[in-house]
């Protein structure tokens, strides 16, 4: 006989919140049945309304707070509750850092089955000023009442919230997005309409070199024509003298994917430049480049510390991207080999190595799980292996290769604690031991957390 859930849709309940989900929603229970409620915090008492009931859990919304958490604060962003970009602005920054450390510990125990009495999970490294950190703004453009709107999508919808400023974006990016929107509106540019697949301007992207002050403007358009091109370029460059590059990307497809395959520089340079520490990077419209360079340096300094390089080591950097970690490692290692599946990223990595005068970094295109075993057969072995995989974590074949190669230490840089925990279990079963985990707050006010992990071969 099927058990009926103890809560009903549209009914009101008085609850106490016990925990947060990894997405940042409050968790309350009615007769042991979990209800997930956005904008609620542990230890808070509230009246909620149930909005959706599933077999094993329900969703609700906050109606009235009766007791507040000491970590509750007023979200400074006026559109925080509508916009889907941040999840934790209603929590003090100290509370966010504690939540992220706890999140990491939880998954290491639950998914990784690690004994945390033997692993040091450090307090989360946060920012002194956790606002205006993003160096890239990428906003959809739409039309409302005959004018252009540009902003972010409302939660769980494709309705654009027009906004003049985003508190986690570099303010220079906000200014540029607004100016480009106004300039385009001035010349009667038509925004792309997703439903009808008509109109021209789909997205505006702005990239900003925080150290160099250089800026790139990218127009993502449905067709390859560019109405009023000369005038629009003239207006942008007059208003923003630090713009070094204006680019058009053409995406003719009926899709949610932002970029199309064709990218053309329509004014200025192909690249802008920025520095992380003393390493210089060339950034194109499509380059993957960390959006918070200040915290990226914190993360990479920790990776260097865990690598313990003395100048005589060979290091392999799996998932090397445009060479960001590789070029930090190359300053202290004898030789660094980087591998990455995206050919354009490897071109960028080689360019960045040249830019920094690195002669001891070598890069190859391919799947890490294919290229690294080939290197192993050729006699290229690593004293230290660094992995910085995408959210899905390391490929199983790569983990098997690591276990076979037996590098003395592995430094794992992760953007997803769940897949990190899964992969650590595989490495532990293969003869490794997890020593230290350092959470880093790369994206304040969101539910994301990065980690740097020191893993050593058992002696």
UniProtKB/Swiss-Prot annotation:
Entry binding sites for S-adenosyl-L-methionine: 290, 319, 340, 388
Active site annotation, chain numbering: 415
Residues of the TRAM domain: 6-64
Domain of life: Bacteria
NCBIfam families reported in the protein's UniProt record: rumA
Family: Belongs to the class I-like SAM-binding methyltransferase superfamily. RNA M5U methyltransferase family.
Name of the protein this chain belongs to: 23S rRNA (uracil-C(5))-methyltransferase RlmCD
Gene encoding the protein: rlmCD
